[in-house]
Amino acid sequence: MYETLRKHIEKTVSLSDAEFAWVKSHFSIKKYKRHQFIIQEGETVGYSYFIVSGLTKLVHHDVSGKSHIIAFAMEDWWESDFFAYLTQTRATLSLECIEDTEVLCISLANYRKLCADLQKVEAFFLEKAHFGNIAAQRRILSLLTSNAKERYLQLLKQYPQLVQRVPKSLLAAYLGVSRETLSRFSN
């Protein structure tokens, strides 16, 4: 499980065995079942999660009770309610497992300690943050400038393996269309 994390980090920076042992000591392993919540709205967010196996959805529930899927995350991706995590405030998003999911968790204190102690790790997390911002910017621009079919085709092009795994009803909700409309896109 930790070897997956090492390979992920070493796509960005190289680590000696001693450095990785230090990194590894700051994470804990958690396992969740399908439909189980990793984070629930209203809770304090204690961790950022590296997904070793499984699939999750990040969801916001508006005042009328409607669910809005913000993102999906699968293996080799990081997920959390990052605002709540970094500010140590209550979550405005829920993170729910679509499949049985195994994660490596890092607390904010351990994250800060690792970044202070190992400049390489700080560089790694900075790059992850930059790519996360790019993904969020692309998502917003897509919502503003593309129709649902164009968003579906872009998602299919960028993340074909994700589209294959996410249930069609959730994919439709993410795209803001009915399941029937999504079926027409697929044909």
Q: Which ranges hold each PLM region?
A:
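Cyclic nucleotide-binding regulatory domains
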Residues: 37-97
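Residues that recognize and position ribonucleotide moieties
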Residues: 30, 49, 71, 96, ...
